[in-house]
């Protein structure tokens, strides 16, 4: 592609005033027709893979999509002009419940609804003025894409990373499907807000826990501290010991991070789902325990972990303390989770808040074994637990040892010698619950044969495609289960009758590896063409922090498995991640139709043009923070672009003549260029816009100075034109061609900073007489005090206010102020 290919045959005269609607559609068509933004991997320049999180095709791009995309688009454009070979693709995350629910509502197929939305949103992205390479577009609901979801799943299964088991799961009664722990927010479905129930079902899981420790290592990826903290907390690594207690149902092992408090254990607590609850419950306690277990089963893990009054019930049985031999009552309580540790705990109420609250509620013993330095002890009726470090007391052979980290290793070693404990590391992270009981997702590529059991579909039969004529009404079973023709098949092992797996995959599978598919979206020999691996990893990935423990964690896990499969040498999918903030409603609340505070970007484009909307969204707030929408604020960028147009094309500028020199203009241009470069590096987009606005003001002044029309002026316009290109691409392209330039401004070279011009040799400072400003003077930065004062005294206004007075003091602060005090 040549630069000349992007130059249109423009016959019409130039508009006297800036008219975005006359130029934006024209240039969008020219760019698309010429293939201006198509990525050529063989083009010169260092590769840079820039990627924004792909959207769900819900119908229309909202203002949040614009906010998330225009700033990274501007940065990608800037990199391209600097000589990088930039890959900037886009696709659609197309599977999911909204499409299925829309199909139910509109009596259509989810595919029909989804592909219509994709076509509409693709056009909206183009009207945004992005440099997206649409030749790499795909939708995750394309069979050519989800074929590789199925291939991956079988490969995971071969490696022992995919398995099926029964157990308690989160269930959304509205969406009629299971949810992963990460999809439950405060006890409610993160998508529809319905209170989540617990059900016992046989489900598919992916063994993400095998990678828990490696997922805590962020050394190969540059992620914001908040994202690292969220993932670290979600993985929940705990280092401690497993201690074994004898019970009437056999040995019971508990996990503790504080083995130094072992002698403070005064009771044991089991999770309601613990396998030994039934055996440990005495006949006298059975009815009460069974009722409690049933009630706990109706709560989610999140609800059980919330602060509130503790509940529980005594089983009637006792455990034997492994050191003291004391009998500890065994209770059942829902604040203990069967999924954490072993599902049972040794309760140390003197040194744990939850155990303390439970002991107080049920009048159980509290035994102090860690005493704070300088403390006289808790006494018989402690008011609160002590969870800090200190000195071990009331613990026999351990007395006098320091509590906490300083002694834990030594205590574990002693307990191991006695055969009652062993060192152990646990993680709160649970395996990824992977199956869903809905239609619009990737079919799980397994069949069930009564003779051969569960078998994977052979690779040459992939993809297992979704059937088209299916009843979508949710019943609690997958709609695929109701399609007898589709689910009836043959066993790949024995050739006998078999039934397809009718659950579909969690749609987060689609976004776990999609960044690899962009490398070769039409490749049919694997998930991606291995010869394109040199484009990896994604150099800059941008998107919302709300994905920190879902998409971002899953994609890191997926890449590590791909590495172990030999598909990539990378351990992380993204070299660098940055999160944008959120554009809120004018009222400061999250935008929603119910609140009536939604801003439609299409309306804004129709009124102001895409470049104005782009500039305003970059200017409105620091990009990483976001903020409330300001309906009046967009007028500022709109007026600014009109002034930009006038700088280039208005022949006469009203106002007094300015005394700017060539050095002044070059300083304004090159210092602005230097700052814009720094701000693009830092992703400080709001200050980029403000710097360009300041430069516009300087050039308006320069147009009223002797510099106007000189080579310095022409250089200034050329550099300014290029500086505009990344942030307001349409007006920059129009200006480029109206000025007679060849090719496209977007393939032009980014200007070089003249470091000498970007630094002033002189400084302008205010001159005061007795504290009141009476003028200003331009002097050398290295001027002496006498030189500065001499220049100040030469100002007519200063002389006027000194006339007839006696100077009593002269103050000179270099680079800042001159003050002559007179009486």
Swiss-Prot record:
Localization of this protein: Cytoplasm
GO cellular component: cytosol
Keywords: Aminoacyl-tRNA synthetase, ATP-binding, Cytoplasm, Ligase, Nucleotide-binding, Protein biosynthesis
Catalysed reactions, as listed in the record: tRNA(Leu) + L-leucine + ATP = L-leucyl-tRNA(Leu) + AMP + diphosphate
Top enzyme category: ligase
Coarse class of the protein's main subcellular location: cytoplasm
Motif ('KMSKS' region): 590-594
GO MF term list: aminoacyl-tRNA deacylase activity; ATP binding; leucine-tRNA ligase activity
Record GO biological process: leucyl-tRNA aminoacylation
Motif ('HIGH' region): 55-65
Protein EC: 6.1.1.4
InterPro entries the UniProt entry points to: aa-tRNA-synth_Ia (IPR002300), Leu-tRNA-ligase (IPR002302), Leu_tRNA-synth_edit (IPR025709), M/V/L/I-tRNA-synth_anticd-bd (IPR013155), Methionyl/Leucyl_tRNA_Synth (IPR015413), Rossmann-like_a/b/a_fold (IPR014729), tRNAsynth_Ia_anticodon-bd (IPR009080), Val/Leu/Ile-tRNA-synth_edit (IPR009008)
Residues given in the record as ATP binding sites: 593
Family named by the database record: Belongs to the class-I aminoacyl-tRNA synthetase family.
Protein name in the entry: Leucine--tRNA ligase
């Amino acid at each position: 592609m040549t630069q000349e290919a992007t130059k249109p045959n423009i016959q019409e005269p130039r508009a006297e005033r800036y008219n975005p609607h006359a130029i934006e559609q024209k240039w969008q068509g020219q760019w698309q027709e010429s293939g201006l933004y198509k990525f050529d991997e063989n083009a010169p320049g260092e590769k840079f893979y820039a990627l924004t999180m792909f959207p769900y095709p819900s119908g229309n791009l909202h203002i949040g999509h614009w906010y998330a995309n225009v700033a990274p688009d501007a940065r990608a454009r800037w990199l391209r002009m600097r000589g990088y070979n930039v890959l900037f693709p886009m696709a659609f995350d197309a599977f999911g419940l909204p499409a299925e629910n829309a199909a139910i509502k509109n009596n259509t197929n989810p595919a029909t609804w989804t592909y219509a939305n994709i076509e509409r949103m693709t056009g909206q992205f183009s009207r945004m003025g992005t440099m997206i390479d649409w030749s790499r577009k795909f939708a995750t609901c394309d069979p050519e894409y989800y074929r590789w979801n199925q291939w991956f799943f079988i490969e995971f299964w071969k490696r022992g990373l995919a398995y099926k088991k029964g157990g308690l799961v989160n269930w959304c009664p509205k969406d009629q499907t299971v949810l992963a722990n990460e999809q439950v927010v405060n006890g409610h479905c993160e998508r529809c807000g319905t209170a989540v129930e617990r059900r016992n079902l046989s489900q598919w899981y992916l063994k993400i826990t095998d990678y828990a420790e490696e997922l805590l290592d962020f050394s190969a990826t540059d992620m914001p501290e908040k994202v690292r903290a969220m993932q670290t907390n979600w993985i929940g690594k705990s280092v401690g010991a497993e201690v074994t207690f004898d019970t009437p149902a056999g040995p019971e092992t508990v996990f503790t991070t504080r083995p130094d408090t072992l002698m403070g254990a005064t009771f044991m607590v089991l999770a309601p789902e613990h396998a030994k609850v039934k055996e440990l419950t005495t006949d006298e306690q059975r009815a009460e325990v069974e009722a409690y277990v049933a009630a706990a089963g109706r709560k989610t893990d999140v609800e059980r972990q919330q602060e509130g009054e503790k509940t529980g019930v005594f089983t009637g049985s006792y455990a034997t303390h492994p050191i003291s031999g004391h009998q500890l009552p065994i209770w059942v309580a829902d604040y203990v989770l069967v999924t954490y540790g072993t599902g049972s705990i040794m309760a140390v109420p003197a040194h744990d808040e939850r155990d303390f609250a439970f002991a107080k509620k049920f009048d159980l013993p509290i035994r102090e074994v860690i005493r704070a330095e300088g403390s006289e002890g808790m006494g018989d009726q402690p008011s609160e637990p002590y969870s800090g470090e200190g000195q071990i007391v009331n613990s026999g052979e351990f007395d006098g040892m320091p509590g906490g980290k300083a002694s834990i290793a030594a205590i574990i070693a002693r307990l191991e010698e006695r055969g009652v404990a062993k060192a152990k590391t646990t993680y709160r992270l649970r395996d990824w619950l992977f199956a869903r009981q809905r239609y619009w997702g990737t079919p799980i590529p397994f069949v069930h044969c009564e003779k051969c059991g569960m078998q994977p579909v052979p690779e040459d039969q992939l993809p297992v495609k979704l059937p088209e004529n299916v009843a979508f009404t949710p019943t609690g079973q997958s709609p695929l289960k109701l399609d007898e023709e589709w689910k009836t098949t043959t066993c790949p092992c024995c050739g006998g009758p078999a039934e397809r797996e009718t659950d579909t995959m969690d749609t987060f599978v689609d976004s776990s590896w999609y960044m690899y598919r962009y490398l070769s979206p039409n490749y049919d020999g694997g998930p991606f063409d291995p010869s394109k691996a040199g484009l990896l990893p994604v150099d800059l990935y941008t998107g919302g922090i709300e994905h920190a423990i879902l998409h971002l964690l899953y994609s890191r896990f997926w890449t590590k498995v791909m590495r172990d499969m030999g598909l990539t040498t990378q351990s992380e999918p993204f070299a660098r991640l940055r999160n944008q903030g959120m554009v809120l409603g004018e009222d400061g609340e999250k935008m929603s139709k119910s609140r009536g505070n939604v801003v439609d970007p299409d309306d804004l484009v129709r009124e102001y043009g895409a470049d104005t909307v782009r500039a305003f969204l970059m200017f409105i707030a620091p990009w990483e923070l976001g903020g409330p929408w300001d309906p009046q604020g967009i007028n500022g960028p709109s007026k600014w672009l009109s002034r930009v147009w006038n700088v280039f094309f208005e022949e006469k500028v009203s106002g007094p003549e300015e005394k700017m020199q060539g050095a002044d203009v070059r300083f304004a241009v090159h210092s602005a260029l230097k700052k814009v470069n720094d701000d693009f590096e830092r992703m400080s987009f709001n200050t980029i816009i403000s710097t360009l606005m300041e430069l516009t003001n300087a050039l308006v002044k320069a147009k009223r100075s002797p510099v106007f029309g000189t080579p310095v002026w022409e250089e200034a316009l050329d550099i300014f034109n290029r500086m505009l290109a990344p942030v307001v691409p349409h007006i920059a392209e129009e200006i480029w061609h109206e000025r007679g330039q060849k090719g496209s401004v977007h393939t032009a070279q980014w200007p070089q900073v003249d470091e000498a011009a970007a630094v002033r040799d002189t400084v302008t400072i205010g001159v005061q007489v007795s504290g009141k400003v009476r003028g200003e003077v331009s002097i050398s930065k290295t001027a002496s005090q006498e030189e500065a004062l001499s220049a100040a005294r030469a100002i007519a206004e200063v002389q006027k206010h000194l006339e007839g007075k006696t100077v009593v003091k002269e103050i000179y602060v270099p680079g800042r102020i001159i003050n002559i005090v007179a009486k």
